[in-house]
UniProtKB/Swiss-Prot annotation:
Promising candidate for a biopesticide. Slows growth and reduces survival of Colorado potato beetle (Leptinotarsa decemlineata) larvae in a concentration dependent manner. Younger larvae are more susceptible to the action of clitocypin. Expressed at low levels by transgenic potato reduced larval weight gain and delayed development. The inhibition of digestive cysteine proteases, intestains, by clitocypin was shown to be the underlying mode of action. Homodimer. This is Clitocypin. Pfam families: Inhibitor_I48. Keywords: Protease inhibitor, Thiol protease inhibitor. Belongs to the protease inhibitor I48 family. GO terms for molecular function: cysteine-type endopeptidase inhibitor activity. Binds and inhibits cysteine proteinases. Inhibits most strongly papain and cathepsin L, more weakly bromelain and cathepsin B while it is completely ineffective against cathepsin H. InterPro entries: Prot_inh_I48_clitocypin. Uniformly expressed throughout the mature fruiting body (at mRNA and protein level). The gene is Cnc1.
């Protein structure tokens, strides 16, 4: 994935292109959970993210909206099942391209847990960390369509 400004739409690995509409990663403020909201006012300006590849091949996802007093992005206080993704000090993530797509990625925390991958998904309009077997089983997984802003 190229560095740039993106909107991140919630999709799944089994349905990476669900059509019109959908929900997008939305910031509501520093140290608050990142939400999944429609790409409409009043949320539109809260859905702009700077995605940057770091030297180690991992990525940071930082809020790039208007009137940002300080830098924050995808982060966490704890990596437990269903813990929220928060808008905090940007952490690094692994972006794994979903096969047969050009712009859909699984966002994985680079945390070593025996036998599981820690991935970002959604639960009741809040982005949360989900745990899946590392062997690829476990069915449909949360994924994100990265739509570049010009």
């Amino acid at each position: 994935l190229e560095d740039g400004i993106y909107r991140l739409r919630a999709v799944t690995t089994h349905n990476p292109d669900p059509g019109v509409g959908g929900e997008y990663a939305t910031v509501e403020g520093a140290r608050r959970p990142v939400k999944a909201e429609p790409n409409t006012p009043p949320f539109f300006e809260q859905q702009i993210w700077q995605v940057t590849r770091n030297a180690d091949g991992q990525y940071t996802i930082k809020y790039q909206g208007l009137n940002t007093p300080f830098e924050y992005g995808f982060s966490y206080d704890e990596l437990e099942p269903n813990a929220p993704v928060i808008a905090g000090d940007p952490k690094e993530y692994i972006l794994q391209l979903v096969p047969s797509t050009a712009d859909v990625y699984i966002i994985r925390a680079p945390i070593q847990r025996i036998g599981v991958d820690v991935e970002e998904g959604g639960q009741q309009n809040t982005l949360t960390y989900k745990f899946f077997p590392v062997d690829g089983s476990g069915g449909d997984r949360p994924a994100w369509r990265f739509t570049r802003e010009e």
